Amino acid sequence: MLFRYLVWLFRFIKVKNVASISLLVIGSNYLTTAIANNTSISPTTSSNHITTAIPNNTSILPTTSSNHITTAISNNITDKDDYTHFSTDKTISDSLTPITLYRAIRSTLNDTGTKTMTDHGLTRPYRPTTVIFHSDTSLPVKNATRDNSIKKIYRQVISFFIQSNPLFPCFKNHEVFLNLANILNTILCIILIKNV
């Protein structure tokens, strides 16, 4: 049912250019589903669904759901490895950390070719994280992410998911980070290009 809705949504969205970008986050008050290694996604949602949009001014407006508030993301995004809010679970791999996946995804911003997670020392292939549609075609525009403004916003999107977020507590788990690229492309996030 959700897939049909997304197809309908894309059919009725008029895309004019790739100058601005917004992220539509379809989630719930608490998303407690663990994403399995087979990349199947079956979210268990609560009664209160929320929709959070990231506007093209590169900031995330506060969204209140019950007693939980998501605040704006800072522009400071660093590569340091000491993210204390990440899980220290070692069941996946000692060499696999959320920041490693973050770097792998971020490296796709400067790459117009097709990459896999194994190219970055990770364990499974993934589709291109950034899905951008041109005005006259439904195919992804591979070089659209080379625009600096899109890079800046997209990096903030990644920061939104890798930081400790009470709205999506399951993202603290390494197993979920293994499928972050698929999540961004399917259930939780839809990247839309709209007018400036």
UniProtKB/Swiss-Prot annotation:
Keyword Repeat attached: yes
Ranges of the Sequence repeats in the UniProt entry: 28-48, 49-68, 69-87
Induction statement: Expressed in the late phase of the viral replicative cycle.
Domain of life assignment: Viruses
Keyword set, alphabetical order: Late protein, Repeat
Keyword Repeat: yes
Family to which the UniProt record says this protein belongs: Belongs to the asfivirus I196L family.
Protein name (Swiss-Prot/TrEMBL): Late protein I196L
Originating organism: African swine fever virus (isolate Pig/Kenya/KEN-50/1950)
Phylogenetic placement of the source organism: Viruses, Varidnaviria, Bamfordvirae, Nucleocytoviricota, Pokkesviricetes
